Regions:
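Cysteine-centered iron-sulfur cluster-binding motifs in ferredoxin-type domains/subunits
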Residues: 88-98
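Flexible, acidic/Gly-rich N-terminal and inter-domain linker regions that tether
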Residues: 3-6, 13-16, 20-84
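Auxiliary Fe-S-binding modules of radical SAM enzymes
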Residues: 254-358
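Catalytic cores of alpha/beta
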Residues: 241-256
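Conserved radical SAM core fold
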Residues: 144-147, 174-179, 190-210, 235-240, ...
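Structural preference for beta-strand elements that scaffold enzyme active sites
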Residues: 135-139, 167-169, 189-193, 228-232, ...
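Glycine-rich S-adenosyl-L-methionine
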Residues: 209-222
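Conserved Radical SAM active-site core
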Residues: 58-86, 99-193
Length: 358
């Protein structure tokens, strides 16, 4: 065997070992979440300040202000084109521990999952279903990964099937091992959404999450089972070959399924996120791209964000995906205007009234 062949064989063996270690790490994280070790009181989870809450903005007036578990997200900076949506705080924390995760900015960097006892969640939903008269999306993936513990989320998901007005939104980065309950029993009041990213981004900063391809596979299975299935490509990082990677991601995605909606977003560097990520000693290379300071933390430069959105809009359009089903998340009013997009002031474009139907 030649030296070149030996080196090639060595590289292949090293890559296989790395892939095996990564897979084992994900499996251990998944198994760990099945073991409920800690609960959180409703009064405590109510007081957790969403890391993206903007304290200087005047609170929008609501007919019902929520309870301890179902709460409105309604404090956004005046220059951001975001509005009210409803959080379902059934749990806090996430075992996937992505380097850039904004949850690092809450609970002093604590990421270990804590769960509200199911009976409290169901009682809170009973009240919410009565007090909120209009069809509403309840986002179960704001302070946690919605599929991090299927055993805990199943009775909550099934609660939504007792009525036909409101829907639960399951936002996740888990793969096929956490979706069996969705495949076993079709449900009409459930929206599934996978957050996916370019392969290089996933390898660098989403190491414990399922690979992008595994997430696409899971989304495809759920979509084929009849669920309203959406995709969130966020945060989009301008890595050296970002155009090639995200173009490939779109091609891979659309070759497997046609999502009901697609959400795009770029990194947001809240100061607490950055501070507690440093304290956790994670790889901070994700923060190198920030160039602009906004009322919602650091962002990529305006022109770079605009270029990213235009590029992805063009690729989606070329692939035949309807742009009316694409939105951008937590962006400035100026960006919406620059892209020629329409938004409804005071309403969330991703989880609000306009996004309720597939």
């Amino acid at each position: 065997m030649s030296k070149i062949e030996k080196r090639k064989k060595h590289r292949e063996a090293a890559y296989k070992a790395w892939a095996t270690m990564k897979k084992e790490k994900r499996e251990k994280a998944t198994i760990k979440t099945q073991k409920i070790t800690e609960f959180i009181e409703p009064s405590v989870i109510q007081k957790i300040k969403h890391p993206e809450t903007y304290r200087f903005q005047q609170v929008q007036k609501l007919a019902w202000k929520g309870n301890r578990i179902v709460l409105p997200f309604h404090k956004t900076p005046p220059d951001i084109a975001c509005g009210v949506f409803w959080e379902l705080r059934w749990a806090y924390g996430c075992p996937l521990d992505c380097n850039y995760c904004y949850l690092r900015g809450t609970m002093r960097g604590r990421m270990k999952p804590q769960y509200v006892k199911t009976e409290h969640v169901l009682e809170a939903l009973d009240e919410a279903f009565t007090k909120i008269p209009w069809p509403t999306i309840f986002n179960a993936g704001e302070l946690s990964d919605a599929l991090m513990n299927p055993k805990m989320i199943i009775p909550i998901v099934d609660k939504f099937e007792e009525q036909n007005k409101h829907k639960i939104y399951l936002l996740t980065k888990f793969g096929i091992k956490n979706i069996q309950f969705l495949l076993d029993k079709p449900r009409k009041q459930v929206i599934c959404c996978w957050s996916i990213n370019a392969p290089t981004v996933a390898k660098l900063w989403e190491k414990a999450a399922a690979s992008p391809y595994e997430r696409i596979k899971a989304a495809t299975l759920v979509k084929n089972a009849g669920y309203d299935t959406r995709i969130r490509i966020d945060p989009i990082f301008p890595i050296s070959n970002w155009k090639e990677e995200y173009h490939h991601l779109i091609n891979e995605l659309l070759s497997h399924l046609t999502p009901n909606r697609i959400i795009l977003g770029t990194p947001r560097g809240l100061w607490k996120t950055i501070e507690y990520a440093k304290r956790a000693n994670v790889d901070m290379s994700w923060a190198q791209f920030f160039r602009e300071h906004t009322s919602w933390g650091k962002k990529l430069s305006f022109e770079q964000r605009k270029e990213i959105y235009q590029f992805l809009f063009n690729k989606l359009d070329s692939a035949g995906y309807p742009l009316s089903k694409v939105t951008i998340c937590k962006e400035t009013v100026d960006m919406w205007n620059a892209l020629g997009l329409h938004y409804t002031p005071g309403m969330c474009n991703c989880y609000g009234k306009n996004a309720f139907d597939p």
